[in-house]
């Protein structure tokens, strides 16, 4: 018998698409197949695959700007790994998995010589478009409040570009990212989350990043629902060593959502006590045992090396999820795996799944990775899997997220 050619929604849609330019063509043909394979691996229904692939083609690709192949550590890359402009992440739980797409909306005008040198325009335009789509629940009031406090204004831009000292400092920043938009794909709906990076705002205003972040969190939480969580996060930061640095926040901007935020911190002094201390912070004792086991299993599966990370090395990312209900603070720890071969990373993740008893994920992960990147040599360190993060899925049970580029 001959082989069976499986026709996917990606293939069917692609028969009828046209592209405005070569960059749009490249984004669809280079990243569309990866998204398609991941949607299938996560068991999204065929109608949902058509839905999310159409969203990618019609609304996300035009906001991705020039197509570039990921290059780890390249100056100007916008996402956490420094490995590219578009991030696909898959979150695994004991019996399920789901996808998220994250990127910095941009345009060809966002360059040093363009009319939007600090890339301030594309995000608001894209949010306006997405807010009109069926299945996308998006409220812009929180976005505006946070943007006013954490992103550059007209006056800030004028200062940063024209005052010699500030202009020189601006050039030394690793990137000019002010926002990342993440879209979680859930049961035919799209749940948006916005990330705010206030480094340029801090440079223009002279304020500390930490102060900007906490002031913004309290401002957007006008009803005080996150008050307890913000207080606990502030206490953690104040007690942390100088190697722990607040970097940015994210906020869920669903129209009907009561509001939940995350505070992201980098940690360059890597040791078990520091990381496990975060993992236990403000958690009820009744659920700490299983949490601690999951963190230890991941730590050992990745063979994390303790010690200080230098300026040219990736730190560990520690995250405090802030919620209105107990537990008010829910931790997340993200480990960089850039530099390891793709196969070694996959085997480490497989060991975690196996030790946690997540049999289906354990058996399918390596094959899934091969399907995402069928033409790559996975015995090389390619940066395709850049971060592995452990979090709490539903306030008690662990979830593992792998970030792909």
UniProtKB/Swiss-Prot annotation:
GO terms for biological process: alkaloid metabolic process. It is an enzyme of class 2 (transferase). Belongs to the tryptophan dimethylallyltransferase family. This is Prenyltransferase phqA. It comes from Penicillium fellutanum. Pathway: Alkaloid biosynthesis. Its EC number is 2.5.1.-. It comes from the Eukaryota. The gene is phqA. Coiled coil: none annotated.
């Amino acid at each position: 018998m001959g082989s069976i050619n499986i026709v996917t929604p990606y293939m069917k849609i692609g028969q009828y698409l046209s592209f405005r330019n070569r960059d749009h063509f490249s984004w669809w043909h280079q990243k569309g197949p990866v998204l398609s394979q991941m949607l299938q691996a996560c068991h999204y229904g065929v109608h949902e695959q058509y839905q999310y692939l159409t969203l990618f083609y019609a609304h996300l690709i035009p906001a991705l700007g020039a197509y570039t192949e990921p290059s780890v550590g390249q100056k100007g890359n916008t996402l956490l790994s420094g490995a590219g402009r578009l991030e696909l992440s898959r979150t695994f739980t004991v019996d399920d998995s789901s996808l998220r797409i994250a990127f910095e909306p941009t345009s060809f005008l966002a360059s040093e010589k363009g009319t939007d040198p600090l890339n301030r325009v594309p995000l608001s335009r894209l949010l306006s478009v997405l807010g009109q789509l069926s299945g996308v629940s998006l409220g812009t009031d929180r976005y505006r409040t946070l943007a006013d406090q954490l992103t550059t204004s007209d006056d800030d831009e004028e200062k940063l570009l024209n005052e010699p000292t500030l202009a020189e400092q601006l050039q030394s920043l690793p990137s000019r990212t002010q926002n990342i938009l993440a879209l979680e794909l859930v049961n035919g709906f799209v749940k948006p989350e916005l990330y705010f990076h206030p480094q340029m705002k801090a440079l223009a205003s002279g304020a500390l990043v930490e102060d900007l972040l906490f002031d913004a969190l309290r401002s957007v939480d006008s009803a005080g629902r996150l008050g307890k969580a913000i207080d606990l996060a502030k206490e953690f930061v104040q007690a942390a060593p100088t190697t722990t640095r607040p970097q940015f926040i994210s906020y869920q901007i669903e129209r009907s959502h009561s509001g939940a935020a995350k505070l992201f911190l980098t940690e360059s002094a890597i040791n078990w006590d520091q990381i496990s201390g975060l993992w236990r912070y403000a958690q009820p004792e009744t659920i700490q045992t299983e949490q601690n086991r999951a963190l230890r299993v991941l730590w050992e599966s990745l063979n994390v090396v303790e010690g200080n990370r230098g300026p040219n090395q990736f730190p560990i990312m520690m995250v405090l999820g802030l919620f209105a209900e107990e537990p008010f603070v829910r931790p997340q720890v993200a480990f960089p795996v850039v530099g390891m071969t793709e196969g070694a990373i996959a085997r480490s993740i497989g060991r975690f799944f196996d030790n946690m008893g997540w049999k289906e994920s354990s058996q399918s992960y390596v094959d899934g990775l091969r399907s995402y990147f069928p033409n790559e040599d996975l015995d090389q360190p390619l940066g395709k899997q850049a971060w592995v993060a452990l979090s709490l899925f539903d306030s008690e049970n662990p979830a593992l997220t792998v970030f792909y580029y």
